[in-house]
């Protein structure tokens, strides 16, 4: 998938430069919507059909969006460029890279929190606050429940992993005892 990331990067960077001139959050929403629409098998089928013109494919993509930016000239040009260059399948990766650029600009990061039990409200807020102090940046949490952890949490921020789960501790003890 590194190849897709390499091809998608210039598109994400160009779109981010355009977004810097306006509302980055609105552009982020637009590119996320485009990525979701582009993953639909029906859309990919229509996009690869020789019976449908490139202009029609671009119009179809834009018509499926809720974002108010979809009617703007810049969004239309971006989508038309992707269609003309047969890069619709790159939209999910473009969205990932756009979000990474947005987070870098905001000094933020996405955090994946996997817990043995559901985390909500004050408990989640307290955990996120302590993680923000540890990682020294604003974090945007995505919480997942995995009962196989037995207890504790596993936190992933970028390429850093903090695993305080009971399962990880047991695995560590097992490794120490069998070594």
From Swiss-Prot:
As for membrane topology, the entry says: Peripheral membrane protein
Question: Which domain of life does the UniProt lineage start with?
Answer: Bacteria
* Gene3D superfamilies on file: N-terminal domain of the delta subunit of the F1F0-ATP synthase
Listed under GO cellular component are: plasma membrane; proton-transporting ATP synthase complex
Which cellular compartments is it found in?
Cell inner membrane
Please report any disulfide bonds recorded for this protein chain, giving both cysteine positions: none
Sorted keywords for this record are: ATP synthesis, Cell inner membrane, Cell membrane, CF(1), Hydrogen ion transport, Ion transport, Membrane, Transport
| Major site of localization recorded for this protein | membrane
Q: Which residues form a coiled coil?
A: none
Supply the InterPro entries for this chain: ATP_synth_OSCP/delta_N_sf, ATPase_OSCP/dsu
Q: Which GO terms describe its molecular function?
A: proton-transporting ATP synthase activity, rotational mechanism
Q: Where is the signal peptide?
A: none
Q: Which family does it belong to?
A: Belongs to the ATPase delta chain family.
Quaternary assembly:
F-type ATPases have 2 components, F(1) - the catalytic core - and F(0) - the membrane proton channel. F(1) has five subunits: alpha(3), beta(3), gamma(1), delta(1), epsilon(1). F(0) has three main subunits: a(1), b(2) and c(10-14). The alpha and beta chains form an alternating ring which encloses part of the gamma chain. F(1) is attached to F(0) by a central stalk formed by the gamma and epsilon chains, while a peripheral stalk is formed by the delta and b chains.
NCBIfam families named in the record: ATP_synt_delta, PRK05758.2-2
**Biological role:** F(1)F(0) ATP synthase produces ATP from ADP in the presence of a proton or sodium gradient. F-type ATPases consist of two structural domains, F(1) containing the extramembraneous catalytic core and F(0) containing the membrane proton channel, linked together by a central stalk and a peripheral stalk. During catalysis, ATP synthesis in the catalytic domain of F(1) is coupled via a rotary mechanism of the central stalk subunits to proton translocation. This protein is part of the stalk that links CF(0) to CF(1). It either transmits conformational changes from CF(0) to CF(1) or is implicated in proton conduction.
Question: What is the name listed in the Swiss-Prot or TrEMBL entry for this protein?
Answer: ATP synthase subunit delta
Task: State the gene name recorded for this protein.
Answer: atpH
């Amino acid at each position: 998938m590194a190849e897709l990331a390499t091809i998608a990067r210039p598109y994400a960077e160009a779109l981010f430069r355009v977004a810097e001139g306006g509302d980055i959050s609105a552009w982020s929403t637009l590119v996320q919507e485009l990525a979701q629409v582009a993953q639909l098998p029906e859309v990919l089928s229509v996009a690869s059909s020789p019976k449908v013109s490139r202009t029609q494919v671009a119009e179809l993509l834009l018509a499926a969006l809720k974002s108010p930016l979809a009617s703007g000239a810049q969004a239309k040009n971006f989508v038309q460029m992707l269609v003309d260059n047969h890069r619709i399948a790159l939209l999910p990766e473009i969205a990932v890279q756009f979000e990474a650029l947005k987070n870098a600009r905001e000094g933020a990061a996405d955090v994946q929190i996997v817990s043995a039990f559901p985390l909500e409200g004050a408990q989640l807020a307290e955990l996120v606050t302590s993680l923000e102090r540890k990682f020294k940046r604003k974090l945007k949490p995505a919480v997942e429940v995995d009962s196989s952890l037995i207890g504790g949490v596993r936190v992933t921020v970028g390429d850093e992993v903090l695993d305080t789960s009971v399962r990880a501790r047991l695995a560590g003890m097992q490794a120490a005892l069998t070594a």
